[in-house]
Amino acid sequence: MDLLTLWNLEREEVLKIIEDAEYFKKNRYGHEILKNKSIALIFESPSTRTRMSFDLAVNELGGHSLMMNEGEIHLGKKESIADTARVMSRFVDAIVARVKNHKTLEDLAEYGSVPVINALCDLAHPCQILADLLTMKENGKNFKGLKLAYFGDGNNVSNSLMIAGAILGMDVVIATPRSYEPNGLFVKKALEIIAKYGEGSLTLTDDPEIAAKDADVLYTDVWISMSDKNKQMDEILKIFPKFQINDEILSKAKKDAIVLHCLPANRGLEITDEVIDGKQSKVFDQAENRLHAQKAVLKYIFEH
């Protein structure tokens, strides 16, 4: 089974992945789930948390990881993605890919014969969000009815947060500048999932105070995403500052609210030092949880 986006998962499946991640966090070593299995790790862009967490996850589950950076693999250059997928499927048992374009993942999944995991692309970041959900749960947050407020650019992280929130019955509010809203297809899918389960909600706004009011979780990401390299910083600095998570915005949330950021952070831009280093910040627990969530994802795809 592939994991390219979260919208193909049922609520029970998401909850089981989180439950397994909790187990792996408490029991880090001594597993052989991936014994005699080799996992290719394809990275088209530099990474700290994603690379470390997946590399360690594979090895700590008893498998072998094969790291392939851009420049070490053809992947559409000199060889079609389809042919690359076919060849790699003869060597490895699964492919974990952090790529620039979602279409690359779709092609790997279509033409390969082994499971493909989206470790990040321009449209979605499902593995990150599963780690986020673990972080919320271990901080006493019940998913159903939880208010999750996201601030900043409507990017891959916001897209996947909407889907996860819809699956679990959250009230998700996405606060972005106009014309920086999340991807329309992901909005549509989230609303369909909300209708399916009959609970939860999705609100898009350009007012960060509406998002912050009585929020249980405040979340932000960098203002210049991987799909926005052509944006000028002066444009960003003109329209994004009011979406910064700072003490004033945090004061409008619930007293026991937590703050998340998928990292790396541009301190002083999307989040202040005071908040990211403050008591309500769980960003480094969140980063650690990538390891445990990746293990749960690997377990899941080999069981389905």
Swiss-Prot record:
Gene Ontology terms describing biological process: arginine biosynthetic process via ornithine; citrulline biosynthetic process; L-arginine biosynthetic process
GO cellular component: cytoplasm
Classification via InterPro entries: Asp/Orn_carbamoyltranf_P-bd (IPR006132), Asp/Orn_carbamoylTrfase (IPR006130), Asp/Orn_carbamoylTrfase_sf (IPR036901), Asp_carbamoyltransf_Asp/Orn-bd (IPR006131), Orn/put_carbamltrans (IPR002292), OTCase_ArgI (IPR024904)
UniProt binding sites for L-ornithine: N156, D221, S225, M226
Subcellular location: Cytoplasm
Alphabetized GO MF terms: amino acid binding; ornithine carbamoyltransferase activity
Recorded catalytic activity of this chain's protein: carbamoyl phosphate + L-ornithine = L-citrulline + phosphate + H(+)
Binding site for carbamoyl phosphate: S47, T48, R49, T50, R98, H125, P126, C127, Q128, C262, L263, R290
Superkingdom per UniProt: Archaea
Pathway: Amino-acid biosynthesis; L-arginine biosynthesis; L-arginine from L-ornithine and carbamoyl phosphate: step 1/3
Keywords: Amino-acid biosynthesis, Arginine biosynthesis, Cytoplasm, Transferase
Role summary: Reversibly catalyzes the transfer of the carbamoyl group from carbamoyl phosphate (CP) to the N(epsilon) atom of ornithine (ORN) to produce L-citrulline.
Family, per entry: Belongs to the aspartate/ornithine carbamoyltransferase superfamily. OTCase family.
HAMAP family the UniProt entry points to: OTCase
Designated name of the protein: Ornithine carbamoyltransferase
Organism in which the protein naturally occurs: Methanococcus maripaludis (strain DSM 14266 / JCM 13030 / NBRC 101832 / S2 / LL)
